[in-house]
């Protein structure tokens, strides 16, 4: 029942929200937002287990699949679509599904989140299998679409995890690993796009970033698998080579082109003074880890 969910409770500090000045509203929001990172901190051990599971999927050429409805679904898609430009993944490695399909990203699809079978259809469409990890996201922790997706994932043998913002969440019953971030009452009662949404975004940032580091997508703290899809990213790629190797910008630009715009290969070529083909071979043997290739 909704009344039992902490995310649906009224916030005692904001009973007079409609009488506050603009500055007071903003200060109240900021004060509440400060509690979110602390709530996430309490779940670090559970998030670590999720990351370990996702890394295992990636190592077995499996995928990370987010499922959610409304804000939760949008946040999953947002995290998924940032992975290709940031980490050089293909668009299948991390995917997000939202109840009602992609059209629901910009406009609510009535009743979609209440249908478990829609998640079945979405996950069947990508051939979900035992190598994959499915993460169900629901602030309330009770969304039928998410529950349906987790049930289906369990049936096909995929790994499962859940992210909710209520303790003892319903979706936790259907996932092997549960992240329950207790964000509490929102300043605007029941508006879980606020603190709950912020918490979910923080957790998703952690999962995707730490998992990508775990499969060699990062050297030191540099995103060496960045895809140069625009001028800004081309410049960033050259700067990454400068930072990683200590060479001048001009030398970095030269090796960037010699390496066919492969930042990892360029770094290995500079530091080991080898040819492009040899750099690729070393990276292959090191399973993509620059540090091991060196």
From Swiss-Prot:
SUPFAM superfamilies: SIS domain
Active-site residues annotated for this sequence: 82 (proton donor), 113
Gene3D superfamilies with a match to the protein in the record: 1.10.8.1080, Glucose-6-phosphate isomerase like protein, domain 1
GO biological process: amino sugar catabolic process; N-acetylmuramic acid catabolic process; peptidoglycan turnover
Pathway: Amino-sugar metabolism; N-acetylmuramate degradation
Any further remark recorded for this protein: A lyase-type mechanism (elimination/hydration) is suggested for the cleavage of the lactyl ether bond of MurNAc 6-phosphate, with the formation of an alpha,beta-unsaturated aldehyde intermediate with (E)-stereochemistry, followed by the syn addition of water to give product.
UniProt family annotation: Belongs to the GCKR-like family. MurNAc-6-P etherase subfamily.
Name the record gives this protein: N-acetylmuramic acid 6-phosphate etherase
């Amino acid at each position: 029942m909704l009344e039992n969910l902490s995310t649906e409770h009224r916030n005692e500090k904001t009973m007079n929200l409609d009488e506050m000045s603009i500055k007071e509203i903003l200060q109240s929001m900021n004060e509440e937002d400060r509690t979110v990172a602390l709530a996430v901190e309490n779940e670090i051990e559970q998030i670590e287990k999720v990351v370990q599971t996702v890394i295992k999927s990636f190592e077995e050429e499996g995928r990370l699949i987010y499922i959610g409805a409304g804000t939760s679904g949008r946040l999953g898609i947002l995290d998924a679509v940032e992975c290709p430009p940031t980490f050089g993944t293909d668009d299948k490695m991390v995917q997000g599904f939202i109840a009602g399909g992609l059209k629901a990203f910009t406009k609510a699809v009535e009743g979609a989140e209440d249908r478990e079978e829609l998640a079945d259809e979405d996950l069947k469409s990508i051939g979900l299998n035992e190598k994959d990890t499915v993460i169900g996201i629901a602030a309330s922790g009770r969304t039928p679409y998410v529950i349906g997706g987790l049930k289906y994932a369990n049936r096909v043998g995929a790994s499962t995890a859940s992210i909710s913002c209520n303790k003892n969440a319903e979706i936790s019953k259907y996932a092997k690993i549960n992240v329950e971030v207790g964000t509490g009452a929102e300043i605007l009662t029941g508006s879980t796009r606020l603190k709950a949404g912020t918490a979910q975004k923080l957790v998703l940032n952690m999962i995707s970033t730490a998992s990508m580091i775990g499969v060699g997508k990062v050297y030191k703290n540099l995103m060496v698998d960045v895809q140069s899809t625009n001028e800004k990213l081309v410049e960033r790629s050259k700067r990454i080579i400068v930072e990683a190797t200590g060479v001048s910008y001009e030398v970095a630009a030269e090796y960037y082109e010699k390496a066919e715009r492969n930042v990892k290969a360029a770094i290995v070529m500079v530091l080991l003074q080898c040819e492009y083909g040899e750099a690729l071979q070393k990276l292959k043997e090191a399973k993509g880890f620059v540090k091991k290739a060196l």
